Amino acid sequence: MAKAINTRRRRALKTGIQGLGLSSLLTGCGSLSKVLDDEIKLDPDSHTESHQRLVGKKPTSAKDQGSAITNHGQAPDKNPRITTESPAHAQRQDESSSINILSLLKLPTIEREFRAAWVASVANIDWPSKPGLSSASLRAEIDRICTQAAFIGLNALIVQIRPSADALYASAIEPTSEFLVGQQGAALADGFDPLSYWIQSCKQHGLEFHAWFNPYRARHASAKSGFHAKHLAKQQPKLVVKYGDHWWMNPAEPKALEWSLHVIDDVVSRYDIDGVHLDDYFYPYPIQAKDKKQSALDFPDETQYKRYRQLGGRLDKPDWRRSHVDTMVQKLYQRVHKQKPWVRVGISPFGIGKPALRPAGIQGFSQYDQLFADVERWCSEAWLDYLAPQLYWKIEQQSQSFEVLLNYWSERLGSKRHLWPGLYTSSIGQAGRMWTSSEILAQIERQGRQPLATGHIHFSMVALLNDRDQIATRLHKGPYQRPSLVPSSPWLSKGRPERPQLIAPDQRGLLSWERPLGSQPWGTTATRWVLHHRANEQSPWSMTHGDVNLNPIILKAKEQYVLRLLNRVGEASDAIAFTWQI
């Protein structure tokens, strides 16, 4: 993405061209009271629920939360310590046990909002801080970013691992990036694989990890080392062209497309990532031609276009170019989900739509005509799981208003996919930009008003790490004060986890539930838990969540609890509500 160093792109932005769940039974003297029965049909995590807005909300009273659920009665569980409420017990306390019976409970909703930041590696914008760091320093920087992200209240990071047909991970296909090791193709120190460590650290901090690829750029203008022998420019030089100070993979060459898709396939197959992410670099941003008779230097693909026409092709050159990018986006979406259906595909295009569809008053750069990105078609065809248009302008900037453009993309995308706009948080404190943290907070508030926009992404992490104009502090104390889960993606999921069958806690309050034997379909396999708890019916609900294999649940006596299990795309099981007393 490299907006901080790309002067042509800055001009475009400025002008608008701008379970612990133990598998074995725990012994103890605790008691559970199960409140909900199997006859109540509740979808606690529908797509509609994921649109509940969080921005600016404080904890509400118990009477304001959830929907009323009553019990119709059912047979007791096999575990004698898990007692089922029935109408006969609803008005009294069971004298033969220490169970407190609940006759009516208002279920809390799962609060959801995508809160993420881009971590750019190109030109060492965010990470690594400089090339050639030791593996210990790389680990320390990764942990610092993840710790700060979790503290602020983020729930995902989007990390650039392929900026220029290179790799910030262990790859047998492409050379190691000079932004990581200093010299393209140099070996990683002591066999350290940064991507594996990124994923591990994100899991430990409760963050999703989305791998960010540039599909076409072969060399960035800031690069200092030459092409390594393993680089595409050396392996298949006919697939790469020079455009100004950049080298670019030619989108018109089918082998170039296959090369990039093979790289992404490799990462998806070998690493436990949550998402595949593309930014706005399809065809390159236009470069001013030296011949002033031309407004911009034309991309060097005339040979391929002539060949296409000679073979009977009828598209004009702009439509022909767009067809290549369309094919890439479609094939990427299909191939990722063929391998791992739960890995979400996201695209972050330039923020202004095609000229023919723009709202009144919106002006500026046309990615449809200049980058040959028909984003509106991708939305219509649903070739993505989330759209993150880069809305890098202020609310009050009429020709490129943040709010007007947010509403535009909401109309284009509808409710069938996620809309998570990109925020230009790095503009805070930049000379001449006059951005403050208040502008970003206002944009988050406006995003919260748009029911189809269920999150946002900060460009970039460095602004949050450095707490520019107290942006990280204000997020932590303000709109991110309450935790939030990533919105679910129900179109990807076949099934959802079953409601947990609880096993009575031991005296420490360590909760577990029965695990299915053998392998299960991924959609019904629980990977995370979410627990709401409160002291009594007059108290607001608090929400915690964790990985079923990493984060144990420790209960406190006498509190009320609602537990749900989630699969890889956030689809939730039915809830089980209970109290526990020693």
Can you annotate each of these PLM segments?
Residues G570-I582:
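Extracellular fibronectin type III
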Residues L555-E571:
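Beta-strand-rich modules
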Residues R162, Q200, H205, K234-W383, ...:
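Polysaccharide-binding and catalytic clefts of secreted carbohydrate-active enzymes
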Residues Y386-I395, R417-V486:
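Substrate-binding cleft of secreted/luminal carbohydrate-active enzymes
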Residues G509-G523:
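Conserved aromatic anchor
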Residues A120, N124-S137, Y216-D266:
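Active-site-adjacent "subsite" loops/lids of carbohydrate-active enzymes
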